């Protein structure tokens, strides 16, 4: 069994991930649940060979030196995969996250008009947040695709690794992969400001320097899209501010209050009848929200989102209620994800 056959099988089953782990049969995650493939267990040598076959020399060297590595891999005609190779107590392991080869449009994903409005802003910071595997990359890809289809701009992305590949439609699109095309997010962002971009996508805002540079880029007239692993708008603001030392916090609040255009926090739910659907909390950078950020009154943000429906804002619970009433998700699924489960 070679790796391309396993990956083709995984993609055909609609799996989000393929897991290889020495001592166990291959497994796939379908609609959120991990299931075994009906194959014999793989030993360390087999897993090691499967992973090594698709690595280049640099990736092998990284894997040997750091005991884990990330890279992307494409099976032509099937899909691209984001790969993490690692070691565990029984030997080698790897996870292949499926990246659909086709960028889904906002229409495909059933995203509302507010996502177009957010994508149309000329400058500022847009954060798409949520836990790992909540579909952030898919949402961002749809937003970039909308810009790419409607505007004559330069889109520059910095990703680790590149997930969705965007063809240049009306826009010029340049995608840079960390460790392959640049040494890191902060290095790429520093030079991005000299590369005449209109839109910058920062795959992950992991550290102080990257967040600082993203804020600067947003302040200097670029539209910056970024991701964080936070689960709500309020937590997102806190997370960004908390990265900075005490003496800079008020300056960062001021920068955020000027440049933040939207925070979209999302989670994935199982759909009735199979598949998954995203639920969002949407906060827009209105004057009221900007004031709350500047004055460090993040706790009041939730009620501002609740009352901001006319401006396109929506709480997660309101979005979940809509999905339940449309018959897309069950009450039980909604209750699991809700901020106030007793409402379901």
Regions found by a protein language model. Give the residues of each.
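Short, flexible helix-loop junctions that flank or precede catalytic/ligand sites
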Residues: 1-344
């Amino acid at each position: 069994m070679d790796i391309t056959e396993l990956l083709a099988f995984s993609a055909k089953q609609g799996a989000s991930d393929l897991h290889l782990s020495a001592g166990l049969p291959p497994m796939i995650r379908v609609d959120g649940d991990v299931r075994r493939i009906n194959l014999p267990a793989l030993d360390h040598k087999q897993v090691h060979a499967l992973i090594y076959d698709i690595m280049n020399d640099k990736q092998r060297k990284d894997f040997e030196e750091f005991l884990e590595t990330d890279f992307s891999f494409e099976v032509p005609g099937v899909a691209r995969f984001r790969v993490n190779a690692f070691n565990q107590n029984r030997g080698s392991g790897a996870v292949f996250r499926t990246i659909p080869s086709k960028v889904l449009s906002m229409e495909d994903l059933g995203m509302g008009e507010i996502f177009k409005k957010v994508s149309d802003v000329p400058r500022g910071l847009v954060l798409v947040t949520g836990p790992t595997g909540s579909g952030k990359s898919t949402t961002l890809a749809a937003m970039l695709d909308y810009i790419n289809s409607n505007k004559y701009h330069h889109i520059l992305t910095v990703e680790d690794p590149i997930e969705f590949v965007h063809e240049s439609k009306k826009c010029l699109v340049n995608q840079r992969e960390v460790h392959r095309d640049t040494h890191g997010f902060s290095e790429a962002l520093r030079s991005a400001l000299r590369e005449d971009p209109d839109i910058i996508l920062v795959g992950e805002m992991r550290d102080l320097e990257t967040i600082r540079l993203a804020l600067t880029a947003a302040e200097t007239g670029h539209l910056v899209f970024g991701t964080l692993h936070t689960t709500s708008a309020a937590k997102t603001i806190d997370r960004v501010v908390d990265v900075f030392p005490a003496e800079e916090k008020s300056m960062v609040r001021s920068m955020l209050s000027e440049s933040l255009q939207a925070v979209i926090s999302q989670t994935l739910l199982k759909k009735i009848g199979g598949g998954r659907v995203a639920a969002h909390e949407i906060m827009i950078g209105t004057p009221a929200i900007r004031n709350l950020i500047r004055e460090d009154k993040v706790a009041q943000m939730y009620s501002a989102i609740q009352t901001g429906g006319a401006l396109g804002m929506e709480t997660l619970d309101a979005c979940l209620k809509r999905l339940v009433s449309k018959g897309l998700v069950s009450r039980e699924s909604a209750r699991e994800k809700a901020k106030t489960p007793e409402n379901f």
